[in-house]
């Protein structure tokens, strides 16, 4: 980043994407301090991919799946869900429900759900048909409520026709 700024590339033409919010913030702070920049305005594209997609798609927190939404989904489907949330710092998903974990992991790996299921050595008592039905029901639930999860954000962003053009 230092070299690009020294070479005259405008800070807003630099896209710096990290896995964690902490790393993006640290990089922006260092560059801002070193070059006398405003981290928030001049280095607006120093962020996580999830944060960038969220911003570019004009999302709001209310449109994102939260714990209460997962809890409601679990109650509707008759599956216990005590924990289910995406980390705001790095977009990772954490759930005590193995079905949701498998559904999310397949999405992250961009694998077909049943192919991913078949590739695992399923030590836990996870039924293939139940997994498929829950994944379909989760899609329907999110669509009916107008909600997205972090994986949906990335997919929607990739499908978006217009993107910012960065020098680096």
Model-identified regions with their sequence ranges:
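SF2 helicase/translocase NTPase motor core
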Residues: 39-42, 48, 67-74, 136-139
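Accessory N-terminal region flanking or inserted into the helicase ATPase core
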Residues: 13-15, 85-168
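P-loop NTPase Walker
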Residues: 1-62
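Alpha-helix C-terminal capping segments
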Residues: 31, 74-77, 160-162
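Hydrophobic alpha-helix position signal
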Residues: 4, 74, 142-143
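Conserved phosphoryl-transfer catalytic core
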Residues: 66-90
């Amino acid at each position: 980043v230092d070299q690009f700024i020294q070479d005259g590339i405008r800070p807003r033409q630099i896209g710096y994407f990290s896995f964690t919010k902490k790393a993006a913030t640290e990089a922006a702070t260092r560059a801002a301090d070193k070059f006398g920049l405003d981290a928030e305005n001049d280095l607006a594209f120093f962020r996580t991919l999830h944060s960038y997609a969220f911003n570019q798609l004009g999302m709001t927190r209310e449109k994102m799946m939260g714990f209460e939404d997962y809890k409601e989904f679990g109650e509707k489907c008759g599956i216990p869900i005590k924990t289910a949330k995406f980390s705001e710092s790095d977009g990772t998903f954490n759930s005590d429900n193995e079905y949701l974990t498998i559904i999310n992991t397949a999405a992250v790996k961009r694998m077909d759900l049943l192919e991913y299921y078949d590739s695992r050595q399923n030590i836990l008592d996870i039924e293939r048909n139940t997994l498929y039905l829950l994944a379909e029901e989760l899609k329907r639930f999110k669509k009916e409520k107008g909600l997205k999860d972090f994986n949906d954000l990335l997919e929607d962003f990739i499908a978006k026709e217009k993107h910012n053009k960065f020098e680096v």
